[in-house]
């Protein structure tokens, strides 16, 4: 199949923000006359939209570029680009490490991609500048499906957590205009979107410079703008989790009863070393408030094992917090040095790798047990499920999520993706609820 120089293919790695950014990239290129290819085999431009949060991110990119290299051998005119956080983080050295790459674009430079692609046709090109004002306001993402949508409300991060590269890859915080967010939400709801997730590195620090609106006010307005649409948001920083935000979540019925609230460690000493800006008692108090005001709320978190200077006692405090809070789920990793971060510059990576791995395994084992038990406790209940797709295992079954973000699989019957279905839970696996459509759907 011949490759079309005006067709592009985007392979997205990493977080929801990257998925939203891929939609922005596609929209900007389509405005310039490019078309999105249905497969990488027909595209004249292949872009990898990348994430730099974990150490293995570059390894994943390297593996995929080996795959792309075969395409390039057969078609030397094929253009290969890296966008997103890895180009911003590793910069022009990537041209040396990966000769197959033709162009690099950082997260603030997507508006000039058509120019960059034209330059790359003549030789390697890069745009890696930070733009403290860029929010891509006015760009409507190109979306491949209409049931769920990500809506970025801010970009960048001002929190200098010691382990994190995000401030170095996405720059300082800037918030999308209040009215623009509401316009996008309204358009999505009118098009039939059933669930909208508001995105930001730290949504809790949202601030609209014109109206003075904070995140709780924005969230309330969004939920009223799309009252028949489920509303989620991620990610929240514990230090900025306000009482007013909790009250908004409790008072609006279409805001999902799920919160991702990364804690990273159960030790106040480690939180201070991580520069998290709060202690563990503050975190506990916020969990208590959430459970008091939103009974049945589902909680998830992030946990890092083996950060610089972590002792056995610090690790045990993390396990203790997990047993106390009983998170529904967690993203769990062991610490890896990210060059340029505060930890890399000022702290020795002094926990042996085998100890990191052992501690991580203890965290994973404990969380898996808690998650499985919480799912078993749901057996016999009736939950409301937004159907997202057919089950991967069988077209006779459907898969969806509860407001608490639990995955549910049930027999299809008369239902279709996009339906909101009341499901009687009859069983569970380690990560999934199993059920059947309830007889009473009202």
Curated annotation (Swiss-Prot):
Needed cofactors: [4Fe-4S] cluster
Instruction: Please give the InterPro entries that the UniProt record associates with this protein.
Output: Elp3/MiaA/NifB-like_rSAM, Methylthiotransferase, Methylthiotransferase_CS, Methylthiotransferase_N, Methylthiotransferase_N_sf, MiaB_methiolase, rSAM, rSAM_horseshoe
Cofactor binding, per record: Binds 2 [4Fe-4S] clusters. One cluster is coordinated with 3 cysteines and an exchangeable S-adenosyl-L-methionine.
Q: Molecular function (GO) terms listed?
A: 4 iron, 4 sulfur cluster binding; metal ion binding; N6-isopentenyladenosine methylthiotransferase activity
Q: Where is each MTTase N-terminal domain found? A: 6-122
Q: Where is the protein found, in the record's own terms?
A: Cytoplasm
**What is this enzyme's EC?**
2.8.4.3
Looking at the record, the residues that make up the TRAM domain are 376-439
Q: Does the keyword Metal-binding apply?
A: yes
Its predominant location is cytoplasm
Q: Which UniProt keywords apply?
A: 4Fe-4S, Cytoplasm, Iron, Iron-sulfur, Metal-binding, S-adenosyl-L-methionine, Transferase, tRNA processing
Any coiled-coil regions, as ranges: none
Q: Identify the residues that the record assigns to the Radical SAM core domain, covering every copy.
A: 143-373
What SMART domains does this protein map onto?
Elp3
A GO CC annotation given for this chain: cytosol
Q: Which Pfam families match?
A: Radical_SAM (PF04055), TRAM (PF01938), UPF0004 (PF00919)
Annotated [4Fe-4S] cluster 1 binding lies at: 15, 51, 85
Residues engaged in binding [4Fe-4S] cluster 2: 157, 161, 164
State the reactions this protein catalyses: N(6)-dimethylallyladenosine(37) in tRNA + (sulfur carrier)-SH + AH2 + 2 S-adenosyl-L-methionine = 2-methylsulfanyl-N(6)-dimethylallyladenosine(37) in tRNA + (sulfur carrier)-H + 5'-deoxyadenosine + L-methionine + A + S-adenosyl-L-homocysteine + 2 H(+)
In which family does this protein belong, per the annotation?
Belongs to the methylthiotransferase family. MiaB subfamily.
Question: What is the stated purpose of this protein?
Answer: Catalyzes the methylthiolation of N6-(dimethylallyl)adenosine (i(6)A), leading to the formation of 2-methylthio-N6-(dimethylallyl)adenosine (ms(2)i(6)A) at position 37 in tRNAs that read codons beginning with uridine.
Q: Tell me the NCBIfam families matching this sequence.
A: miaB-methiolase, MiaB/RimO family radical SAM methylthiotransferase
Question: Subunit arrangement?
Answer: Monomer.
HAMAP family tied to this protein: tRNA_metthiotr_MiaB (MF_01864)
Q: What protein is this chain from?
A: tRNA-2-methylthio-N(6)-dimethylallyladenosine synthase
Q: What is the lineage of its organism?
A: Bacteria, Pseudomonadati, Chlorobiota, Chlorobiia, Chlorobiales
């Amino acid at each position: 199949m011949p490759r079309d120089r005006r067709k592009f293919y985007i392979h997205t790695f990493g977080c929801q923000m990257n998925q939203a950014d891929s939609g922005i990239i596609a929209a900007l290129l389509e405005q310039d006359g490019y078309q999105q290819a249905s497969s990488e085999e027909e595209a004249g431009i292949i872009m990898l939209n990348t994430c730099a949060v974990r150490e293995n991110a570059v390894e994943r990119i390297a593996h995929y570029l080996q795959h792309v290299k075969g395409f390039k051998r057969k078609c030397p005119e094929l253009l290969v680009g890296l966008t997103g956080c890895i180009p911003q983080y590793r910069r022009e050295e990537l041209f040396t490490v990966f000769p197959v790459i033709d162009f690099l674009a950082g997260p603030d430079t997507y508006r000039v991609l058509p120019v960059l692609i034209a330059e790359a046709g003549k030789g390697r090109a890069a745009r890696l500048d930070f733009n403290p004002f860029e929010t891509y306001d006015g760009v409507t993402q190109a979306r491949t499906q209409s049931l769920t949508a990500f809506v970025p409300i801010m970009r960048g991060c001002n929190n200098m957590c010691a382990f994190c590269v995000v401030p170095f890859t996405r720059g300082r915080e800037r918030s999308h205009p209040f009215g623009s967010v509401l316009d996008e939400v309204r358009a999505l709801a009118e098009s039939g979107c059933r669930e909208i997730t508001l995105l930001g590195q730290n949504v809790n620090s949202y601030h609209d410079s014109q109206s003075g609106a904070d995140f709780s006010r924005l969230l309330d307005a969004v939920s009223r703008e799309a009252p028949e649409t489920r509303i989620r948001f991620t990610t929240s920083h514990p230090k900025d989790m306000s009482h007013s935000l909790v009250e908004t979540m409790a008072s609006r019925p279409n805001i999902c009863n799920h919160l991702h609230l990364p804690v990273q460690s159960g030790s106040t000493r480690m939180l201070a070393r991580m520069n998290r800006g709060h202690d563990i008692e503050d975190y506990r108090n916020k969990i208590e408030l959430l459970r008091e005001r939103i009974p049945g709320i589902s909680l998830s978190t992030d946990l890092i094992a083996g950060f610089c200077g972590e002792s056995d006692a610090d690790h045990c405090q993390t396990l203790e917090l997990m047993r106390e809070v009983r998170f529904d789920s967690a993203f769990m990793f062991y610490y890896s040095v990210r060059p340029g971060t505060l930890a890399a510059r000022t702290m020795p990576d002094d926990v042996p790798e085998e100890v990191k791995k052992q501690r991580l395994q203890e965290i994973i084992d404990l969380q898996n047990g808690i998650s499985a038990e919480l799912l078993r406790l749901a057996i016999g209940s009736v939950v409301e499920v937004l159907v997202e797709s057919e089950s991967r295992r069988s077209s006779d079954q459907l898969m969806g999520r509860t407001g608490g973000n639990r995955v549910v699989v049930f027999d299809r019957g008369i239902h279709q993706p996009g339906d909101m279905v009341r499901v009687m839970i009859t069983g569970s696996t380690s990560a999934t609820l199993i059920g059947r459509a309830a007889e009473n759907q009202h």
